[in-house]
């Protein structure tokens, strides 16, 4: 009996089972213990293969692929700390709803807790973060193939969002020629091998039903809060809110066109909050809100009803409102709850939104990150997409820009970490094949610098704008101790990215003004390669501009 041959047959069943649940993209890191999984993936023509040498980046690459494809994405890594590097991407997927399937190779049980090399306690290591965790036994013909495939099917068939961790121990030898070992074991699955359906099919999840009192609530004074959603959903939500005559407060990830722009500015005005006190019902569609003033208003508002509609399960309401948590696809929910044409009930807020935008426009000429945030809609590629980093940059875009309705916007706003942003952007571009504009800060770029290797392989133009404000300037917006702020919070690194781009043979520009930036962008959109544009700005101007605008708009 060949151990290596049966390892591969066991792995082949696992990988084939994944294809029955829509898995097409598979991300593979180098490793020896994962050889059975890697070879099974390589031999399966249903997969699109992606490779990367850094498991943390690989997990985020898978996250980006899943964001766009809306399908589960598989990841294969070897044993040991390679597995732990998948933790950040798994956490993010659990909070934002992407489906990741982590296939982690492991040592067999007799090599755990005895000093064996690269052997750690992998089962359960991700605690409560996976939606499902499966600890497979070592491959053996004593366990029927139908148990293995139905175990995979059960986990994936009931997976609505988040990650599945499948721990796969393999004994040595891992290498060798294939023979007939385990062939009859494998063939007992019969015509499943020629089929394209799961062995075990789970009943679909039930979504929230139509709210029978909607006809009553839609006649009230309502507010629509739009969080993260798809581009198509964003357009539908904007039309729905307009028909109802309800003000729509749109997050940067809502893709609604933000008909009342600069909400994070005008929500700091007492006239706006006073008018919003008349709200009888808030309908929040989507989660992961960005703006500080929006979150403050959300926490303090006291409508008669607060409804949250999102496809993701869980509470999704840090303010713990009295109301309804409705688990449903947003577009489907809108169909079940049609709008009734009514006149807008807010008077002050549209005026304040217009005045706030004019205040931003009046400051647009200076070459800085706040101005870039406002101008970003002018720089979006046609038929393309935007990926927004975390920390200060996403807050500036949320507060100062007005993105077009239905234009795809992606970000990692679940746990809102700055790790893996370049890798996620790479996955977003690969899955869509669209021209992509990505914008991150300098610390975010440094954190995921080796992901520039992934950006060498793009199918359409990708522009990475690195806003270099020399540190974590978001802490300038917080009451951090002044004497300790620079060393312990901002942590300026005094670096530039020209040599990093050169190392990975990427085009690089460092514009000094808007004309040079726009010229670099025109050139970048012409060829299907990656261009790094480093925008060096004054350290504190972005945060100061936001604070000045907040003060100005609060007194309108």
From Swiss-Prot:
<dbReference type="GO" id="GO:0000287">
    <property type="term" value="F:magnesium ion binding"/>
</dbReference>
<dbReference type="Pfam" id="PF02776">
    <property type="entry name" value="TPP_enzyme_N"/>
</dbReference>
<dbReference type="GO" id="GO:0030145">
    <property type="term" value="F:manganese ion binding"/>
</dbReference>
<dbReference type="GO" id="GO:0030976">
    <property type="term" value="F:thiamine pyrophosphate binding"/>
</dbReference>
<dbReference type="Pfam" id="PF16582">
    <property type="entry name" value="TPP_enzyme_M_2"/>
</dbReference>
<comment type="subunit">
    <text>Homodimer.</text>
</comment>
<dbReference type="InterPro" id="IPR004433">
    <property type="entry name" value="MenaQ_synth_MenD"/>
</dbReference>
<comment type="similarity">
    <text>Belongs to the TPP enzyme family. MenD subfamily.</text>
</comment>
<dbReference type="InterPro" id="IPR011766">
    <property type="entry name" value="TPP_enzyme_TPP-bd"/>
</dbReference>
<protein>
    <recommendedName>
        <fullName>2-succinyl-5-enolpyruvyl-6-hydroxy-3-cyclohexene-1-carboxylate synthase</fullName>
        <ecNumber>2.2.1.9</ecNumber>
    </recommendedName>
</protein>
<comment type="pathway">
    <text>Quinol/quinone metabolism; 1,4-dihydroxy-2-naphthoate biosynthesis; 1,4-dihydroxy-2-naphthoate from chorismate: step 2/7.</text>
</comment>
<dbReference type="InterPro" id="IPR012001">
    <property type="entry name" value="Thiamin_PyroP_enz_TPP-bd_dom"/>
</dbReference>
<dbReference type="GO" id="GO:0070204">
    <property type="term" value="F:2-succinyl-5-enolpyruvyl-6-hydroxy-3-cyclohexene-1-carboxylic-acid synthase activity"/>
</dbReference>
<keyword id="KW-0808">Transferase</keyword>
<keyword id="KW-0464">Manganese</keyword>
<dbReference type="InterPro" id="IPR032264">
    <property type="entry name" value="MenD_middle"/>
</dbReference>
<keyword id="KW-0474">Menaquinone biosynthesis</keyword>
<comment type="pathway">
    <text>Quinol/quinone metabolism; menaquinone biosynthesis.</text>
</comment>
<dbReference type="GO" id="GO:0009234">
    <property type="term" value="P:menaquinone biosynthetic process"/>
</dbReference>
<comment type="function">
    <text>Catalyzes the thiamine diphosphate-dependent decarboxylation of 2-oxoglutarate and the subsequent addition of the resulting succinic semialdehyde-thiamine pyrophosphate anion to isochorismate to yield 2-succinyl-5-enolpyruvyl-6-hydroxy-3-cyclohexene-1-carboxylate (SEPHCHC).</text>
</comment>
<keyword id="KW-0460">Magnesium</keyword>
<dbReference type="InterPro" id="IPR029061">
    <property type="entry name" value="THDP-binding"/>
</dbReference>
<dbReference type="Pfam" id="PF02775">
    <property type="entry name" value="TPP_enzyme_C"/>
</dbReference>
<keyword id="KW-0479">Metal-binding</keyword>
<keyword id="KW-0786">Thiamine pyrophosphate</keyword>
């Amino acid at each position: 009996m060949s151990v290596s041959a049966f390892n591969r047959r066991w792995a082949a069943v696992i990988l084939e089972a994944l294809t029955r649940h829509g898995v097409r993209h598979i991300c593979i890191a180098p490793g020896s213990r994962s050889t059975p999984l890697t070879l099974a993936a390589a031999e399966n023509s249903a997969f699109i293969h992606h490779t990367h040498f850094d498991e943390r980046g690989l997990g985020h690459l898978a996250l980006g692929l899943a964001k766009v494809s809306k399908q589960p994405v598989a990841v294969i890594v070897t044993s040991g700390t390679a597995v732990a590097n998948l933790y950040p991407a798994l956490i993010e997927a659990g909070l934002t709803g992407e489906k990741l399937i982590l296939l982690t190779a492991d040592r067999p049980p007799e090599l755990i807790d005895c000093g064996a090399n690269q052997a750690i306690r992998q089962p359960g290591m991700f605690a409560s973060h996976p939606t499902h965790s499966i600890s497979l036994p070592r491959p053996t013909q004593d366990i029927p193939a139908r148990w293995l495939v139905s175990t995979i099917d059960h986990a994936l068939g009931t997976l609505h969002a988040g990650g599945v961790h499948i721990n796969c121990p393999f004994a040595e030898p891992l290498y060798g020629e294939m023979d007939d070992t385990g062939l009859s074991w494998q063939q007992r699955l019969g015509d499943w091998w020629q089929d394209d359906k799961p062995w075990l099919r789970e009943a679909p999840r039930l979504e929230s039903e139509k709210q029978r009192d909607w006809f009553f609530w839609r006649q009230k004074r309502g507010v629509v809060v739009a969080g993260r959603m798809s581009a198509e959903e964003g357009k539908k939500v904007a039309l729905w809110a307009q028909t109802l005559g309800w003000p729509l407060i749109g997050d940067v990830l809502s893709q609604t066109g933000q008909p009342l722009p600069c909400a994070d500015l005008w929500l700091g005005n007492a006239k706006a909050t006073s008018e919003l006190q008349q709200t009888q019902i808030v309908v929040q569609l989507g989660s992961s809100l960005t703006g500080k003033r929006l979150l403050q208003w959300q926490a303090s508002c006291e409508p008669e009803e607060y409804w949250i509609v999102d496809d993701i399960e869980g509470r999704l309401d840090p303010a713990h409102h009295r109301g309804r948590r409705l688990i449903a696809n947003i577009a489907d929910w809108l169909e079940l709850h049609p709008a009734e044409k009514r006149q807008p009930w807010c008077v002050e807020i549209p005026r304040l939104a217009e005045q706030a935008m004019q205040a931003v426009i009046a400051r647009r000429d200076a070459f800085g990150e706040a101005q870039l945030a406002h101008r970003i809609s002018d720089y979006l590629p046609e038929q393309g997409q935007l990926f927004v980093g975390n920390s200060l940059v996403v807050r500036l875009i949320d507060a100062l820009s007005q993105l077009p309705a239905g234009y795809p916007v992606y970000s990692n706003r679940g746990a809102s970490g700055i790790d893996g942003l370049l890798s996620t952007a790479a996955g977003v571009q690969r899955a869509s094949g669209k021209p992509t504009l990505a914008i991150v800060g300098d610390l975010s770029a440094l954190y995921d610098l080796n992901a520039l290797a992934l950006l060498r392989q793009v199918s359409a133009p990708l522009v990475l704008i690195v806003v270099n404000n020399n540190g974590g300037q978001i802490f300038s917006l917080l009451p951090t101790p002044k004497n300790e702020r620079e060393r312990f919070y901002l942590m300026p690194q005094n670096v530039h990215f020209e040599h990093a781009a050169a190392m990975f043979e990427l085009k690089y520009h460092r514009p000094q003004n808007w004309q040079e930036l726009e010229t670099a962008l025109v050139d970048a959109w012409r060829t299907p390669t990656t261009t790094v544009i480093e925008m060096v700005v004054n350290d504190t101007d972005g945060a100061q501009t936001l604070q000045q605008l907040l003060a100005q708009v609060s007194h309108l």
